[in-house]
Amino acid sequence: VLVMEKNLNYRIATTLKEYLEKNEGIKVILTRNSDYDLSLSNRIKYAVDNNADYFISVHVNSRSTDEVDSHGCMVLMSCSRYQPSNAKVASVYDSEMRMAKSIISKLNVLGLPIANDWNTENTGILQRVTTVGETYPDGSPADYYTLLYCGTKAGLPSIIVEHAFLSNEGDYRNFLSTNEKLDALAKADAEAIIESIR
């Protein structure tokens, strides 16, 4: 059976939207409502143009076939404390960190451990600096990941949630193999997001 990451991501994202919008004052705008591709920088632009307060990118992780032991969850966030003047929050970095910690905690409660093979210092939070020497306007090193770089420059707290490894049989079976399991991930995300912004 061929399982495509984009389909799992879409199920988690649409269910997350449903859970979040049960809370008064929360409106969720998806960057895709069907099977089409929007560039990473245009996703942030779309969010900014729609006056978003946060950008959450929903993913399922994967490794090559010779690295099937990789398992667990992590959240990617900015490595920089750069704070553009147009930011809606007092600290983009602190907002991302608060949300990332909350999501990791809720996913851990589901039984999904912190990713075992990434440089997350056992926190489940990954921050990666660009490899080409690019910087933010304040001179701090820019982020490696386009979504995080564009989000930070736009003053929009942005994170990437990697829920589990599609390439790991145990992660797939325990967390990704049914709609009910995907919905549980979305519910954990929703609880964490609400907790971190209230």
Regions found by a protein language model. Name each.
Residues 3-198:
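Active-site-proximal helix/loop segments of hydrolytic enzymes
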